Each structure stands twice: as structure tokens, then as C-alpha cells.
Regions:
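Acyl-donor (CoA/ACP) binding surface of acyl/acetyltransferases
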Residues: 144-173
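Conserved GNAT acetyl-CoA-binding A-motif
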Residues: 110-122
Length: 173
């Protein structure tokens, strides 16, 4: 399992996260049918919020030589439940434990209720987020389908809710 560093994104990280964002949105387009803007970019208001809104936080995961392995965006830091809004691991690091290590560090920083959304069609995400919920809450987590606001033609998102009531051991078990 690779050694990773997980930390809050700083202003200097923004160009790197913007590049990773393009990869993330490209991956997600398989499930949401989204096309890039005419200039080749994708919607990025969530990315902007991670750097500009105090109720949001961006995280970066890096490996040896500070090479990027992924990022996460959390919203509702002051709300009743934190929402893991966006989560991305570069393809070469998927299924290597990077995602579980990263989410463990992030969730441990914000104990309490959490929610994460993903698409039923994304079988890898389905397995991963159910495993994450079980790691943190045992069998005490819930799953529901919620329509996507403004997109009635898309299948509903799957939302998992769990509570991280204590500092979680960041070593995957």
C-alpha cells in the first residue's frame, strides 16, 4: 500500500487541483452524460467553493516527491452533516488503498454525521462507499436514492449517511 500524505488544499495547490478536476469530471461524464464547455473545461463552481467558501474544504492526497494522487471536496462544514461532495483518486492509484486512507484522514478531521452521493451505475463507487460506511459505522449507516435537482432525466443519486463519532484509526483494516 503506498504511503500518502493527506492535507487541506492551499491556494498554491489550486492549479494542480484544477487539473485533477478535469480528470474527475471526465470520469464522471460516463455517469452524468456531461460534456465539457466549449473551451474544454467542465463546471467548476464546487472546485471554486473549496478554495473560496469557509463552509467548504478541499483536500489533496500526495505520494512520493509530492506527486498528486487525488483530491476531495467537503461541504457543509458548519452544517448538521458534512457532505463529501467530490472525491477523486488518479487511475494508477485506484484499488491500492489510497482512497480508503484519504477518506479516513478527512473524516477523522470532522467527527460527526457524514453524507456522500454516488451513482448506482458506478459499481466501483458503490462498493467503495459501502465499505467506507461500514469501516466507520459498522452496520449503523443508511442508504437512500435522491433525485438530482434540475436533472429529472438522470437516475437518482445514491446517498450514504453514517456517523463518525470518534477518531477513526487511519490504517485501513
Amino acid at each position: 500500500m503506498p504511503m500518502i500524505s493527506v492535507r487541506r488544499a492551499r491556494a498554491a495547490d489550486r492549479p494542480m487541483v484544477e487539473r485533477l478536476w478535469l480528470m474527475f469530471r471526465h470520469d464522471m461524464s460516463e455517469f452524468d452524460g456531461g460534456l465539457p464547455n466549449p473551451d474544454g473545461t467542465f463546471r467548476a463552481e464546487w472546485l471554486a467553493a473549496a478554495f473560496e467558501d469557509r463552509n467548504w474544504a478541499g483536500y489533496v492526497f500526495t505520494g512520493p516527491e509530492d506527486r498528486p494522487m487525488g483530491f476531495a471536496i467537503v461541504r457543509s462544514l458548519d452544517g448538521p452533516a458534512r457532505v463529501l461532495n467530490s472525491f477523486f483518486v488518479v487511475r494508477s492509484m485506484r484499488r491500492a488503498g489510497v482512497g480508503l486512507q484519504a477518506v479516513s484522514v478527512i473524516v477523522a478531521e470532522h467527527p460527526g454525521p457524514w453524507e456522500v452521493a454516488f451513482q448506482d451505475a458506478n459499481a466501483v463507487a458503490v462498493r467503495f462507499w459501502r465499505r467506507v460506511a461500514t469501516e466507520f459505522a459498522g452496520s449503523d449507516w443508511s442508504e437512500e436514492r435522491r433525485g438530482i435537482p434540475g436533472k429529472p432525466d438522470l437516475p437518482p443519486d445514491v446517498w450514504i449517511s453514517f456517523t463518525a463519532a470518534r477518531r477513526h484509526d487511519t490504517r485501513p483494516g
